[in-house]
């Protein structure tokens, strides 16, 4: 399908708008991926609040130019997909890493998180970062354990004082 120049400009503008509101982006190779697998990936990404787009490389390079994500233009070779995390920086990495575990041909090329390039070896680490709700839960559990520990220490001190008297 041949796109008109106006349609191409609209695609580039839309991707640039997504760049402005996203906290991270991950690019991956799509060769030998079935349409059913792609539909599954789209469903998972929608559920996690991740915006994914298959876009021609020349248009992607134009959209990447003069942005925080410009270093990803080196990976615009072959058929690619780009995923954007809108809410949590690790969401896109988490969705694509989980998808790559079930699809041997799906290869993650690189990512950018808040302006810093992350190579494919470190993307697993990014995908394991807790999201906002998980972080809050961990903080609450730590505070809860600390307060119970303090209460036990106070009770132990009081019991020692009572025994001494």
Curated annotation (Swiss-Prot):
One of its GO terms (molecular function) is large ribosomal subunit rRNA binding. GO terms for cellular component: ribonucleoprotein complex; ribosome. Keywords: Ribonucleoprotein, Ribosomal protein, RNA-binding, rRNA-binding. GO terms for biological process: translation. Gene3D superfamilies: 3.30.70.1730. The keyword Transmembrane helix does not apply. It comes from the Bacteria. Pfam families: Ribosomal_L10 (PF00466). The keyword Ribonucleoprotein applies. InterPro entries: Ribosomal_uL10, Ribosomal_uL10-like_sf, Ribosomal_uL10_bac, Ribosomal_uL10_bac_type. Part of the ribosomal stalk of the 50S ribosomal subunit. The N-terminus interacts with L11 and the large rRNA to form the base of the stalk. The C-terminus forms an elongated spine to which L12 dimers bind in a sequential fashion forming a multimeric L10(L12)X complex. NCBIfam families: PRK00099.1-1. Belongs to the universal ribosomal protein uL10 family. HAMAP family: Ribosomal_uL10. Forms part of the ribosomal stalk, playing a central role in the interaction of the ribosome with GTP-bound translation factors. This is Large ribosomal subunit protein uL10.
């Amino acid at each position: 399908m041949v796109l008109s120049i106006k349609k191409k400009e609209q695609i580039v503008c839309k991707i640039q708008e997504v760049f402005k509101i996203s906290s991270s982006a991950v690019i991956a190779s799509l060769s030998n991926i079935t349409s059913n697998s792609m539909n599954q990936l789209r469903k998972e990404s929608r559920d996690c609040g991740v915006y994914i787009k298959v876009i021609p490389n020349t248009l992607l390079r134009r959209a990447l130019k003069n942005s925080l994500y410009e270093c990803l233009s080196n990976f615009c070779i072959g058929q690619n997909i780009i995923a954007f995390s809108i809410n949590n920086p690790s969401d896109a990495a988490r969705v694509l890493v989980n998808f790559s575990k079930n699809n041997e041909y799906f290869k993650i090329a690189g990512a950018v998180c808040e302006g810093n390039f992350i190579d494919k070896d470190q993307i697993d680490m990014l995908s394991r970062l807790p999201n906002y709700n998980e972080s809050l839960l961990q903080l609450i559990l730590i505070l809860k354990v600390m307060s119970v520990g303090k209460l036990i220490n106070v009770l132990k001190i009081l019991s020692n004082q009572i025994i001494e008297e």
